[in-house]
Amino acid sequence: MNDLRNIPQVDKIIKNEAFSGLDTSLVTMLARQILDEVRAKILNENASFESEEIINLILDEYYKFNEASLQRVLNLTGVTIHTNLARSVIDKEILKRATPVITGYSNLEYNLKTGSRGNRYDYVGSLIARAFGFEDAIVVNNNASAVFLVLNTFAKGREVVVSRGELVEIGGSFRVPEVMANAGCILKEVGTTNKTRLNDYEEAISDETAMLVKVHRSNFDIVGFSEETTANELSELASRQNLIDYFDLGSGFYGNLPFNLDKNEPDLKNLKDVSLVSFSGDKLLGAVQCGIIVGKKELIAKLRKNQLLRMLRVDKVIISLLAESIKAYLNKEFELITTQKLLHKSVKELENLANFINKSLKTPLEIVRTQTFVGGGAMPNKKIPSVALAFGGDANLNELKFRQKKVIGRIENDKFMLDLRSLLDDDVETLIKIINETEEK
């Protein structure tokens, strides 16, 4: 068919039995789109199309349209908090506990005792504060929002003192200096890239100073000839000068981390004297995406009054899942925090898992010891021991074959590898099945 007169009309083509049972309005929309493309190709390229071919083009677009854009993948990169693969995983038990609230009406902003309007942050705020030892807390949609809200609330139009070595950029071109400017603050840099002492901050304080800010360099490190001021030292200086001190912790963790990961890493339990601290919920904490701000009660109260909070607030889904995750910490149910569970797996456990998988494969794979990273922009210079299954043959071809099966691995030393550090327990049998199916072809 290369004659425009032979192109079927939309109302006729959608009556084809191939579209029986499908959404008529969507089929109609896609039919118009495909027929326009067919006309253009006939005119511009002298292309030829058969009716059956046009029907198949419409069907292909229909099923693509209905396929979920977000799809389940198996993370075999070894990176536990993989930003591109949605960071921390929520345990099914956490989801189960939160489900009654998520799937029904709730007292999100209703006080059951008084029968009047309530505040969505009261419960989760007190829960976080109790868990981590702070006076109060508030939650926004991510840590970038937390940084912006804190700066805008307490330092708009005034000076913010920060170390030159902490003016970082994280993923998505999020740059601290630009965020400060957009929040209405005046940036005052102190120290040098590799050294910033307490007296550098002290000498920079003026009548226009509102805050002393520390930013954790979570996604890079300065080694060698370097020196920095701790958050607690900055807090003491701020207290003497009647200023607010704020620590953008970034990843943030509480408790213990394996493989010496917590060495020189600021722990929430050691920051209780800092006026305000913010961190991500879906990184080392292992909960949902959000930004958590903890600190002095009177300062959190001022944050709640900022009109920006309505634009940055979280919904009942985030609050419910976060609350259940925090309760797991309080109850020492660390096995329900998937990120912590994966990071704490020993090399021996991973080797046992590799052997178990190999016994179920038609063709056993090479088991290799390797190293990986935490991910999520945290601890970039700290490697974690791990165990992987390595494939022979063309590494790029193997990577493509498994990616098409929604199994994401990595290439190392010219071999395609499936790193078991990030493999979820529920995905083991699925992985075995996919390996066997893929290796048969």
From Swiss-Prot:
Keywords: Cytoplasm, Protein biosynthesis, Pyridoxal phosphate, Selenium, Transferase. The keyword Protein biosynthesis applies. It is found in: Cytoplasm. It catalyses: L-seryl-tRNA(Sec) + selenophosphate + H(+) = L-selenocysteinyl-tRNA(Sec) + phosphate. Its main location: cytoplasm. Its cofactor is pyridoxal 5'-phosphate. Its EC number is 2.9.1.1. GO terms for biological process: conversion of seryl-tRNAsec to selenocys-tRNAsec; selenocysteine incorporation. Pathway: Aminoacyl-tRNA biosynthesis; selenocysteinyl-tRNA(Sec) biosynthesis; selenocysteinyl-tRNA(Sec) from L-seryl-tRNA(Sec) (bacterial route): step 1/1. GO terms for molecular function: L-seryl-tRNA(Sec) selenium transferase activity. GO terms for cellular component: cytoplasm. The modification N6-(pyridoxal phosphate)lysine is found at K283. It holds the Pfam family SelA. Belongs to the SelA family. Converts seryl-tRNA(Sec) to selenocysteinyl-tRNA(Sec) required for selenoprotein biosynthesis. This is L-seryl-tRNA(Sec) selenium transferase. It comes from Campylobacter concisus (strain 13826).
